[in-house]
Regions:
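Short, structured segments at the rim of ligand-binding sites
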Residues: 1-182
Length: 182
């Protein structure tokens, strides 16, 4: 079976706040955007049942299209915002702060305070040459490339296929327009 609403409740609540909708199905969840502008949010990552840190990268891509300023505090892992450099090269307006913008309890003792990314939107994304750095950051680059105007070249996509089963087939089923080198 697929994911359940209960397992993803925090993510689903944020998804709705941004402007998305979803239906719980027997074998998973169907997501869609009902139209209208995306809304900015302020979130902090956390361990389950909080907002999962693995979801912050694709959320940040979506927030580049939200109207206003969003803030994402990363409180679980260090150095999770490196992927934003490529998004800025594609036209995003993301500023990463090495110490948080608010007083949040540390999750891991003796580590620096959490990082925060401030995303100001909406900003049109344009095509660029992007190299996949890691699994989740790279998948976010791929999402941004698909959302961008113009052509992007994404290299090192083998990393993504190791972490997401049949992702190329799934992208095609969603109507993504891309070519693989021969």
């Amino acid at each position: 079976g697929g994911a359940t609403q209960q397992e993803l409740m925090t993510f689903l609540n944020v998804y709705r706040k941004v402007g998305g909708e979803f239906d719980g199905l027997e074998d998973g969840i169907r997501f869609w955007h009902p139209g209208g502008p995306l809304k900015p949010v302020m979130i902090e990552t956390d361990v389950h049942p909080g907002f999962m840190t693995d979801c912050q990268q694709p959320l940040i891509v979506a927030l580049t299209q939200a109207e206003g300023e969003s803030v994402v505090h990363e409180t679980v892992y260090e150095n999770r915002f490196g992927f934003t450099e490529a998004l800025n090269e594609m036209g995003a307006n993301i500023v990463v702060h090495q110490s948080g913008l608010a007083s949040i309890t540390r999750r891991v003792p003796r580590r620096p305070l959490e990082q925060a990314a401030v995303i100001t939107g909406p900003t049109p994304l344009h095509g660029a040459d992007v190299r996949v750095p890691d699994l989740r950051g790279g998948f976010s680059h791929l999402i941004a490339a698909l959302a961008a105007e113009g052509t992007s070249t994404v290299s090192n996509v083998g990393i993504i296929s190791r972490g997401y089963e049949l992702f190329i087939d799934k992208l095609r089923q969603l109507g993504a327009d891309f070519e693989l080198p021969s």
